């Protein structure tokens, strides 16, 4: 997995200071690791937003003003419920060889070859990421899932993801019964059927009269 660099700065942790940082285009954040003191920092909002909406996962080298670096990963992000802006982030340090749990984005291949798509269906992605467990060197930037064998109306669950997808390098620890992707009938067909039923209703009422 590739790493990216984030320049960070220490920050005060009172509410007024946090608001001021957000007004300056920065996001209040914390960095923690089991057995170590939590560090309060701030990061550039644009850089963090780009990372959050990336289709790949990354390790992050947090660089402090004194030149020190801490390798970490993004653990959690909080959004404003009204504006959807990022208002807080949690990063987690880790040591070499430590087993991590991370959310990794999903990508899909073989859509055009899937019998369900050939029959007119659409691919509906349900899970855009999966939680995996592994040492950092084995965590992928994304998990590629082949849907080329899926039929119309079929749903793939986590437990059905082929083992060769991850080659034993990491463990998927999300709920195995969770649905990942489905091939569904086009909505247009459903709308046409509903419209036809509505047109037939007055005719039935007329006969009863």
Swiss-Prot record:
Keywords: Ribonucleoprotein, Ribosomal protein, RNA-binding, rRNA-binding. The keyword Ubl conjugation does not apply. Gene3D superfamilies: Ribosomal protein L25, beta domain, Ribosomal Protein L25, Chain P. InterPro entries: Rbsml_bL25/Gln-tRNA_synth_N, Ribosomal_bL25/Gln-tRNA_synth, Ribosomal_bL25_b-dom, Ribosomal_bL25_C, Ribosomal_bL25_long, Ribosomal_L25_dom, Ribosomal_uL5_bac-type. Signal peptide: none annotated. GO terms for cellular component: cytosolic large ribosomal subunit. GO terms for molecular function: 5S rRNA binding; structural constituent of ribosome. GO terms for biological process: translation. It comes from the Bacteria. The keyword Transcription does not apply. This is one of the proteins that binds to the 5S RNA in the ribosome where it forms part of the central protuberance. Part of the 50S ribosomal subunit; part of the 5S rRNA/L5/L18/L25 subcomplex. Contacts the 5S rRNA. Binds to the 5S rRNA independently of L5 and L18. Belongs to the bacterial ribosomal protein bL25 family. CTC subfamily. NCBIfam families: bL25_bact_ctc, PRK05618.3-2. PANTHER family: RIBOSOMAL PROTEIN L25/GLN-TRNA SYNTHETASE, ANTI-CODON-BINDING DOMAIN-CONTAINING PROTEIN, RIBOSOMAL PROTEIN L25_GLN-TRNA SYNTHETASE, ANTI-CODON-BINDING DOMAIN-CONTAINING PROTEIN. This is Large ribosomal subunit protein bL25. The lineage of its organism: Bacteria, Pseudomonadati, Chlorobiota, Chlorobiia, Chlorobiales. The gene is rplY.
